[in-house]
Amino acid sequence: MDPQLMEVSQQFERFKAAFIIKDFDTCSSLLSQLKLFDHYLISLSLNALLLLTCALFFLCTRNRIPPSPQENLIMGLNLLRLLVQNRIAEFHTELGLLSSATLENPCIKHAVELEQSFMEGAYNRVLSARQTAPDETYVYFMDLLAKTIRDEIAGCSEKAYDHLSISEGCKMLLFSSDQQLLTYVNEEHPEWEVKDGLVVFQKTRETAPCKEIPSLQLINQTLSYTRELERIL
């Protein structure tokens, strides 16, 4: 077995042992260490043994211990984590491992509908989905996703406009009040200026001058190539 994979497996075994005896301080420490291997695990090939060892341990014990009542909740949170990190391919890989009955569970269904809205660009639906989250633990990831969406819109807006009115800014960035917009500007974009009821963007790009296309030169070159081809033929 790969040495790094062996280390991950050993750390995971220690994590399980600490969890069984309710040593949550050790659990927290080991979980932090396991997170460091996250990107390494992404690069692994889809080998059944590796998956069973590192990612799908619960499948091995399904017939030995009763399913956790939190199983669907945790799987739903993992899907949200992948969505927030924009790891869409892995999101769909995880979905492919779930049964049709599991896909109908509210915790899973909520994450699937959220991904569909996100990919369609229906950002209002994404933000409003926070109110229908199946569990309060989802709110953390929903807030991260909302920030990701607003940052993306903000980046596009400052490149497309010189300024926006505060009301237009609220609508564009999906805020329900002027104060929310002002707080966002102060915390996330101090380079923007708010004055006279406008949000003035600080231009970060330089407009490159358009170069004239040397059309006559291109025509002459094309005719020259044509004459050369005629000689060859």
From Swiss-Prot:
Belongs to the proteasome subunit S14 family. One of its GO terms (biological process) is proteolysis. The modification N-acetylmethionine is found at M1. Acts as a regulatory subunit of the 26S proteasome which is involved in the ATP-dependent degradation of ubiquitinated proteins. The gene is RPN12B. Residues 38-217 form the PCI domain. Component of the 19S regulatory particle (RP/PA700) lid subcomplex of the 26S proteasome. The 26S proteasome is composed of a core protease (CP), known as the 20S proteasome, capped at one or both ends by the 19S regulatory particle (RP/PA700). The RP/PA700 complex is composed of at least 17 different subunits in two subcomplexes, the base and the lid, which form the portions proximal and distal to the 20S proteolytic core, respectively. Interacts with UCH1 and UCH2. This is Putative 26S proteasome non-ATPase regulatory subunit 8 homolog B. Keywords: Acetylation, Proteasome.
